[in-house]
Amino acid sequence: MAAAALGTSVLARLAWVLFLPNGMNFVDLHVYVDGSANFGSGHLFDYTDSSKTPDFPLPFTYPPFAALVFYPLHFLPFSVVAIGWLLATVAALCGVVWLALELMVGTAAMREPNWRTAALAWTAVGMWLEPVRSTFDYGQVNVFLVLLAMVAVRSGVWWISGTLVGVAAGIKLTPAVTGLYFAARKRWITAIWSAAVFFGTIGLTYLLTPGETNKYFRELLGDAHRIGPVGSSSNQSLRGVLSRFVGHDVVSGPLWIVAALVTAVLAFFAWRALASDDRLGTLIIVQLFGLMVSPISWSHHWIWLLPVILWLVYGPLRQAAGARVLAGYWLVVTLIGVPWVLGFFQDSIWTISRPGVLSWLGAVDAIGVLALYIWIIRSGRLRNGRPVDRSSEQQPIGRCNNCYDGVNRAPNIRGGRDIRLRGYDFRGPQPALASRELRSVIHPTRKFVL
């Protein structure tokens, strides 16, 4: 059933691409392919494409390293690149869902048919969330970058994790925020190596095309207006939300600074409220913070909302009051695509001022993030009842200091199902449930599979 749903979603998307008038839009993919063809010419950042967006000719806005990565694509027919990009994005989305579930339930559980079915089903659903829909429409790179971050978090090898994040940041600066995740997990060497790899991408392009590298990092970096209209409803960052409320670009002024500090404080305490082994929870707190404080966070940048929904449904706080409400909120907002709908009600993408109700509706993502942080702080503390142990995660895979015999295994009494005890996964026989109190902290993992 789940495989059929995913297949139907893929076929529907292909039909959308092939048969609808604007199906082969791929405006951003055109910029990647045609813009990168100028790599090394000295005119990379002079390129613009206005064929689909006459009100805003799209420039190449990524670092020169991204152009180097995309450069080989311009040798292929664009139709081949587009279809391949679409199918690769579906595969990457499936990888994102799979890794999100694996970070919560463990590698062994993902071998079970139930969890494989859940991964396929959520991939089928995820294809129709607005951030993913827009990623398909524009031919954006976001799903691939999210996948790189997820693989980096899953890996316990410092140089692999650091290389993946450093390369992702070299392609598009925003994944650099993943370094905060490594700091939160006390993976200091990984954080340092990711920064070194990122600067290595800059050094490489400086050797190949020093003029373009200098121009990007000395002149263009930080120019949000070159990326697009800050006040557009599609910009769901704090800067975009606040600008729409006050009617002008707040830039990085006092109002933005206060909002960013409040967000940072809430993100910090939300992280502190999580269980020490909740890697996915930590990751989404960090990534949502990055989306909030970035000058521009288009609605299609918010791919991370799919892992957020999965974490609310299957994560360690899934039974806390409000978890289903928040999951439902994000599902409704992303399936409808509220920022996308609001785009039809603005005079132009350059108009910042708008009626108050549209400003509030245009803040759905920012409001949702702040509500999520506050909910995590409350629910995490109620569940834990004591400060969370923030010891380093650098311990052998399969070890668990709070588990029987020091490993992820329940006592050998009787039964045979996987169980979950206070946030830990145990692979082994299920103990007899002798009391109602014990039942309240032990839950068969199978119970929570779609």
PLM segments and residue spans:
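Primarily membrane-embedded glycan-assembly and transfer machineries that use lipid-linked glycans
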Residues: 1-161, 185-302, 352-356, 362, ...
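Aromatic-enriched
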Residues: 313-391, 398-401, 448-450
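Repetitive helical segments and hydrophobic/amphipathic motifs
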Residues: 393, 398, 402-403, 410-417, ...
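Transmembrane alpha-helices and membrane-interface helical segments
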Residues: 95, 99, 147-158, 182, ...
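Juxtamembrane/interfacial segments around transmembrane helices
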Residues: 48-60, 169-175, 224-226, 243-253, ...
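Transmembrane helices and adjacent periplasmic/lumenal helix-loop junctions
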Residues: 165-182, 294-304
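Alpha-helical transmembrane segments and their cytosolic interface
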Residues: 295, 303, 334-337, 437
